[in-house]
Amino acid sequence: MSLKERFTSYAYLIRLDKPIGTLLLLWPTLWALWLASSGTPSLQMLMIFIAGTFLMRSAGCAINDYADRDFDRHVQRTKHRPVTSGKISGKEAVVVAGVLALIAFLLIQPLNIFTKELSVLALLVAFIYPFTKRFLAIPQAVLGIAFGFGIPMAYAAVLDFIPLEAWVLFVGNIFWAIAYDTAYAMVDRDDDLRLGLRTSAITFGSYEVLAIAFSYGVLFVSQLWVAHLASLSNYFLIGWGAALGCAIYQLKLVSSRKREDCFLAFRHNNWLGGFLFLGIVLGLSIQ
């Protein structure tokens, strides 16, 4: 394998070609940073968390491909991934994940000890998540915890404690992950059933669209609660309303249960997260 081919394989391993995962991890982190800092996060803090988000998502992808290497080759959508196709060994994937996680940990050294302690828990959850598809009925809940760990970490970094609004934001994010990753799991449901894997799309069965709607409901109610706790102005509702429109559109898509519609609904969550961030920015900056 040439150097160019090896670089390309590593790029695919950490999903450089698919930034949606990084964005779904980044939006909740930005929500928390803006709320914790009352709308004025320091540039250093912002850069640390943005870079850390990219590194940890990349590490998570590498460990996910290692964990799923014996399953991915049997799924049409994933059979060409670098590890399962043999372009990268399982050992290499683990090393890549470890190196990226180490860089992320070194990156947060300027932050307080509380944030560093939380980062260890975040790493453990991120590395455990891929294996939960073997035994948990709704592994998407663990994904929500992993993708939401930037929330308590951001509050800890800025305030050195975690207030109630952070936990409300965190719980809402878990349900958001259940919503968008259930749509994602609907794409591979037939393959996952054949392989004996467990996902929320399988667990919810014919009620999966209702479960997605309920999860979105929890997200949007939690956002309103956070807005109240953080004393955001009514301008927050501009972003909140736009995000709600996104959710309604996504529910319409997944209701068809077509693979391409479910995948589009999943990807469309980037806009939902961005609109909620816009609402927080407006609610903090315009009183």
From Swiss-Prot:
Pathway given for this chain reads: Cofactor biosynthesis; ubiquinone biosynthesis
Name of the protein in question? 4-hydroxybenzoate octaprenyltransferase
The membrane topology noted for this protein in its Swiss-Prot or TrEMBL record is:
Multi-pass membrane protein
Q: Which gene produces this protein?
A: ubiA
The kind of enzyme this is, by top-level EC class, is: transferase
In alphabetical order, the GO MF annotations are: 4-hydroxybenzoate polyprenyltransferase activity
Looking at the UniProt entry, the stretches that span the membrane are 19-39, 43-63, 94-114, 118-138, 142-162, 167-187, 209-229, 235-255, 263-283
Keywords attached to this Swiss-Prot or TrEMBL record, sorted alphabetically, are: Cell inner membrane, Cell membrane, Magnesium, Membrane, Transferase, Transmembrane, Transmembrane helix, Ubiquinone biosynthesis
Main subcellular localization, coarse class? Answer: membrane
